[in-house]
């Protein structure tokens, strides 16, 4: 349940970034990792209150998202080949991993839960749902609803929608495209910090590669649900999370990742646009 709801949240964030910037931010999982390390250092090393540590993580990750977009992605936004941006995104991901490796080393960092909540026991105690899982599920639903309301009800959200539909037309209407995309990355990276906190609360161990696989699986779920669709991303996260859980329970825990990526191949062959994705033909 926890992995399912966490993936929902990652999907909604990554989907919105792609829909507006028209690029896959493969460094998103590594921003989650950085946010987790910030909380680890703040709580275990500096002795900060967990709430202050979470706020510090959100601020740092938000600023990091803006810097990454401005330095690494913006100069290549109008590149002749979309592969240039894709390769840069992968490069940023490896850069963040190796910087974390230099600073904190390869050893696994363990620490006490940042979020400590009572568990919910069902069926006479035979089914136990941890407090972190409950918070993650509710948080995923609230974030999806909040993003949809933000996009539909605010001027900034409407600007994001306009940029995602047609950057050129949006610019002609007076929308600052660069600012809009920067705001998108800021929001996505800030929420990634929250994802990092919840991830470390559920699995209190940390390495420089903590965010790599969750980030890739988030991309798979986004493709499954339909890139560019927030509800589709949410559904994709739920379905893939359930498939992964049942795969571990009834097939093999070692095959769980293979099942996820097998679903990606099937979706790309059968319905490349995903469950709720739209087949949009771009005019050249």
Q: What does each model-found stretch correspond to?
A:
Residues 47-59, 185-192, 198, 202-262:
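Transmembrane alpha-helical segments in multi-pass inner-membrane proteins
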Residues 126-206, 230-236:
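Helix-loop-helix "hairpin" substructures at the membrane interface of multi-pass membrane proteins
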Residues 36-40, 58-64, 92-100, 139-148, ...:
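Hydrophobic core segments of alpha-helical transmembrane domains in multi-pass membrane transport
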Residues 75-76, 82-153, 180, 246, ...:
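Transmembrane helix-bundle core of multi-pass membrane transporters
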Residues 1-9, 13:
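Single conserved hydrophobic/aromatic residue that forms the stacking wall/gate
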Residues 16-36, 50, 79-84, 156-159, ...:
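Short, non-helical or kinked segments that cap or interrupt transmembrane helices
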Residues 47-92, 99, 235-240, 271:
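Alpha-helical transmembrane segments within multi-pass membrane transporters and channels
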Residues 20-67, 71, 226:
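Membrane-embedded helix boundary and interhelical linker motif in transport proteins
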């Amino acid at each position: 349940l926890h992995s399912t709801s966490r993936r929902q949240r990652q999907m909604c964030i990554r989907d919105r970034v792609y829909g507006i910037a028209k690029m896959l931010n493969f460094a998103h999982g590594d921003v989650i990792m950085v946010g987790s390390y910030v909380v680890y250092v703040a709580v275990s090393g500096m002795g900060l209150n967990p709430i202050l540590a979470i706020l510090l993580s959100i601020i740092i990750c938000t600023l990091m998202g803006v810097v990454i977009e401005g330095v690494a992605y913006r100069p290549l936004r109008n590149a002749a080949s979309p592969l240039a941006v894709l390769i840069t995104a992968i490069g940023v991901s490896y850069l963040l991993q190796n910087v974390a490796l230099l600073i904190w080393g390869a050893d696994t960092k363990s620490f006490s839960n940042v979020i400590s909540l009572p568990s919910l026991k069902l069926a006479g105690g035979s089914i136990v749902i941890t407090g972190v899982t409950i918070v993650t599920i509710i948080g995923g639903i609230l974030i999806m609803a909040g993003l949809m309301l933000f996009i539909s009800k605010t001027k900034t959200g409407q600007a994001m929608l306009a940029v995602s539909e047609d950057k050129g037309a949006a610019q002609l209407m007076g929308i600052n495209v660069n600012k809009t995309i920067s705001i998108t990355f800021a929001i996505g990276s800030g929420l990634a910090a929250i994802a990092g906190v919840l991830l470390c609360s559920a699995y209190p161990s940390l390495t420089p590669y903590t965010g790599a696989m969750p980030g890739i699986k988030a991309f798979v779920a986004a493709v499954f649900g339909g890139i560019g669709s927030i509800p589709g991303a949410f559904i994709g996260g739920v379905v893939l999370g359930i498939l992964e859980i049942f795969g571990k329970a009834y097939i093999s825990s070692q095959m769980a990742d293979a099942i996820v990526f097998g679903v990606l191949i099937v979706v790309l062959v059968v319905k490349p646009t995903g469950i709720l994705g739209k087949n949009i033909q771009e005019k050249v």
